[in-house]
From Swiss-Prot:
Function (record text): May play a role in DNA repair. It seems to be involved in an RecBC-independent recombinational process of DNA repair. It may act with RecF and RecO.
GO molecular function: DNA binding; zinc ion binding
Family: Belongs to the RecR family.
Zinc finger residue extent: C4-type: 57-72
Name listed for the protein in its UniProt record: Recombination protein RecR
A Pfam family the protein falls into: Toprim_4
Keyword DNA repair: yes
Superkingdom per UniProt: Bacteria
The keyword Zinc belongs to this UniProt entry's keyword annotation: yes
Organism: Hamiltonella defensa subsp. Acyrthosiphon pisum (strain 5AT)
Xref: InterPro entries: DNA_Rcmb_RecR, Rcmb_RecR, Rcmb_RecR_Znf, TOPRIM_dom, TOPRIM_RecR
NCBIfam families: recR
Length: 202
């Protein structure tokens, strides 16, 4: 069956979503067209609004429609003197659900990967270093995904913190090697935060 060029374009757009292959994209496209069209229109409007209005927090780089996100604007969180470094804004959601952290964050939007040409500047490390040198930070918690690149990124940041005399800790057991933080259940992640361990290079 020859498919409409408009439907083909819709399916191709849906395939850009993570985990969506050709069959899933076709299923989603036909579902949107077969169901109440108002739902699809609302989805399109919400997507357009998010794409045009959501930017990055000037302090932590998470997604927000404000110059500074609610967490970074919270004076109580600032006084805690803690920064939790994560790879993605979705990791913030996962950690917030545990209720075990009340400091502020820094989002890398990735991780160091020299083979892919991703260096310190590409993941915002100059901005993080500026915060380390200007804010009264007592502890940096490294909550990167347990991958080779994540470990390399953690070590790089830990050494950077050491230059400023700032303690660094790393979330502990329970997060599987090669896994994504956002996929870890709340209880496991909570234990990993509570059981975080210092990073030493001596």
């Amino acid at each position: 069956m020859q498919t409409s060029l408009v439907i083909e374009a819709l399916m191709e757009s849906l395939r850009h979503l993570p985990g969506v292959g050709p069959k899933s994209a076709q299923r989603m496209a036909f579902y949107l067209l077969q169901s109440d069209r108002s739902k699809g229109i609302r989805l399109a409007e919400s997507l357009l609004k998010a794409m045009s209005e959501i930017g990055h927090c000037g302090v932590c780089r998470t997604f927000t429609e404000q110059p500074c996100c609610d967490i970074c604007s919270n004076v109580y969180r600032e006084k805690m003197g803690q920064i939790c470094v994560v790879e993605s804004p979705s990791d913030i959601c996962a950690i917030e659900q545990t209720g075990q952290f009340s400091g502020r964050y820094f989002v890398l939007m990735g991780r160091l990967s020299p083979l892919d040409g991703i260096g310190p500047d590409d993941i915002g490390l100059p901005l993080l270093e500026h915060r380390l040198s200007t804010e009264p930070i007592k502890e940096v918690i490294l909550a990167m995904n347990p991958t080779v690149e994540g470990e390399a990124t953690s070590n790089y940041i830990a050494q950077m913190c050491e230059e400023y005399g700032i303690s660094t800790t790393k979330i502990a057991h329970g997060v599987p090697i090669g896994g994504d933080l956002e996929m870890v259940d709340e209880t496991t992640l909570s234990h990993a935060l509570v059981g975080r361990r210092p990073m030493n290079f001596n």
